[in-house]
Curated annotation (Swiss-Prot):
InterPro entries: PsdUridine_synth_cat_dom_sf, PsdUridine_synth_TruA, PsdUridine_synth_TruA_a/b_dom, PsdUridine_synth_TruA_C, TruA/RsuA/RluB/E/F_N. One of its GO terms (biological process) is tRNA pseudouridine synthesis. GO terms for molecular function: RNA binding; tRNA pseudouridine(38-40) synthase activity. The keyword tRNA processing applies. It is an enzyme of class 5 (isomerase). This is tRNA pseudouridine synthase A. It catalyses: uridine(38/39/40) in tRNA = pseudouridine(38/39/40) in tRNA. Belongs to the tRNA pseudouridine synthase TruA family. It comes from Ligilactobacillus salivarius (strain UCC118) (Lactobacillus salivarius). NCBIfam families: hisT_truA (TIGR00071). Substrate binds at residue 113. The active site is at residue 55.
Length: 256
């Protein structure tokens, strides 16, 4: 009897070439499928389907995948089995048996990303893989003033990297906020939206940092929506500071 599993993953993206499987590359999908197929011991290969891709160096606190497993096993048994086989930079943090029409990508209602920025003149060696570093002066009040402009439904063409396969660049951001983590001397950005374009969060963060540094006017996002020109927002924040925090679904879609 085949069972469909919804699995939530946390991973350190430093040594992964992104989420999606690629030839001769160590990816999150590769190590997860390796563990699942080892547990299955069947000739038919089991494929994992993710809620979306993360790039090389990008981390996840709550990436979601689904797959169909050919043997009866409890959710707890699956969680323990996978974690006994996965490398130390990838962990299953939650596991559920879900209906066969649940799809990790196509039934999602939104995603939440974090971006952490470390401060200081020099790069902290213990943060270099887990934050983006910004050494220049910042007025966080200017950034806070700009954050409402990030929210809403807009054409984010100025904030998408080349290589995007999206047919439309219109997205809705329900919530955008920034706050200081004074204990770690970091600035944290948080974005919750119905979906995000290729490198969108990293480009938006780089643009907001330029606003905080006085290189751009506070409400420059409004102009960038109008011009729809990536060359007007050239900078991209490093992958190391980006975290996929959570993927949202309707609880009804997960009920058996």
């Amino acid at each position: 009897m085949t069972q469909r599993f919804k699995v939530t993953l946390a991973y350190d993206g430093t040594n992964f070439a992104g989420f999606q499987a690629q030839p001769n590359q160590r990816t999150v999908q590769f190590v997860l499928e390796k563990a699942i197929n080892k547990m299955s011991k069947k000739d038919e290969y089991i494929t994992v389907y993710g809620s979306g891709r993360t790039d090389s160096g990008v981390h996840a606190l709550g990436q979601v995948v689904h797959f169909d497993f050919p043997h009866p096993i409890s959710a707890k048994g699956m969680l323990r089995g996978l974690n006994s086989m996965l490398p130390l930079d990838c962990e299953v943090v939650d596991c559920k048996i879900v209906p066969n029409d649940f799809h990790s990508r196509y039934t999602t209602h939104g995603k939440r990303y974090l971006y952490r920025v470390s401060r200081g003149e020099f790069v902290n060696p213990f943060k270099r893989l887990y934050t983006g570093h910004y050494k220049y002066p910042l007025d966080i009040e200017k950034i806070k003033e700009a954050m409402p402009d990030v929210e809403g439904t807009h054409d984010y063409s100025s904030f998408v990297a080349s290589g995007s396969q999206a047919k439309s660049h219109v997205r809705t951001i329900y919530e955008a906020k920034v706050y200081e983590d004074k204990v770690n001397d970091e600035i944290v950005f948080e974005f919750y939206g119905n979906g995000f374009l290729y490198n969108q969060v990293r480009i938006m963060v780089a643009t907001l940092l330029e606003i905080g540094n006085g290189k751009r006017p506070v409400h420059d996002f409004l102009r960038l929506y109008e011009v729809k020109d990536r060359s007007q927002a050239r900078q991209t924040a490093p992958a190391s500071g980006l975290y996929l925090k959570e993927v949202y679904y309707d609880e009804e879609d997960e009920k058996l």
